[in-house]
Amino acid sequence: MDFLLEALTNWLKEMLVGGIMSNLSGMFDSVNQQVADISVQVGQTPQGWNGSIFNMIENLSNSIMVPIAGVILAIVMTVDLIQMIADKNNLHDVDTWMIFKCVFKSAAAILIVTNTWNIVMGVFDMAQSVVAQAAGIINSDASIDISSVMTDLEPRLMEMDLGPLFGLWFQSLFIGITMWALYICIFIVIYGRMIEIYLVTSVAPVPMAAMMGKEWGGMGQNYLRSLLALGFQAFLIIVCVAIYAVLVQNIALEDDIIMAIWSCVGYTVLLCFTLFKTGSLAKSVFQAH
């Protein structure tokens, strides 16, 4: 009877240990790949990230938004002229400089609208240059490596009782599901930012048309601040990855495999949280809303 019980116990142990090793091996591969891809993704300009989407957005902006921006520009300049006349006692106190001012503002506004795409792309080119310089300075490996604490893991697991092994198996299963969820979160942040950039740039001529307006000028100024926030969000993301890289390098020093794995999960959750915060932080820095 004892022989059967011992055989059953060993069989359960082998099954649980095999399941634990299977859950742990390659658990962080997808997250490591996504984290390594962050620097590549955020360091690209809208044109370099996806040329097909870029060309489509450029065509939509030039063919649809620019004519609408022209109408808005005419309205804004007309309203400004009417206000200028009303402020000067219905032309009784008018000076010649008012005419030159109106002509200059109109010419500047037309120049801005016709070169909106170049201005917008210039903002992201500048941000890409900053990110490239930051990535060159940081140059840290952010991959999670727990192979050093898994070398003698299987013999240590076989020495454990069934109860702790069941608990460890459930933990490894839960951690595996958690890491996939974190992989999806990182994907959403990085790709969501690029989609937001394309959406914002597609309507660029409309807010830029109001840039020179007295009453409507705040629309264009806030739009420029939003562009700067989106561009420099990439720099904040690079800093987050650099901090994450420093933290995960200490994981290999852990002797306890469970502590090492939960540390990996904790650091990755922290990375996801900070990545989600980079957008609002960048907007608060540039006072964009």
Regions found by a protein language model. Name each.
Residues 74-78, 113-120, 188, 192, ...:
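Alpha-helical transmembrane segments of polytopic integral membrane proteins
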Residues 81-88, 211-216:
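Structural signal for the C-terminal ends of transmembrane alpha-helices
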Residues 60-68, 103-107, 184, 188, ...:
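Loop-to-transmembrane-helix entry motif
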Residues 1-72, 88-97, 107-178, 217, ...:
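Gly/Ser-rich, low-complexity
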Residues 67-79, 197:
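Hydrophobic alpha-helical transmembrane segments
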Residues 98-100, 196:
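Cytoplasmic-side transmembrane-helix entry/capping segments in multi-pass membrane proteins
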Residues 166-217, 235, 239-245:
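Hydrophobic alpha-helical transmembrane segments of integral membrane proteins
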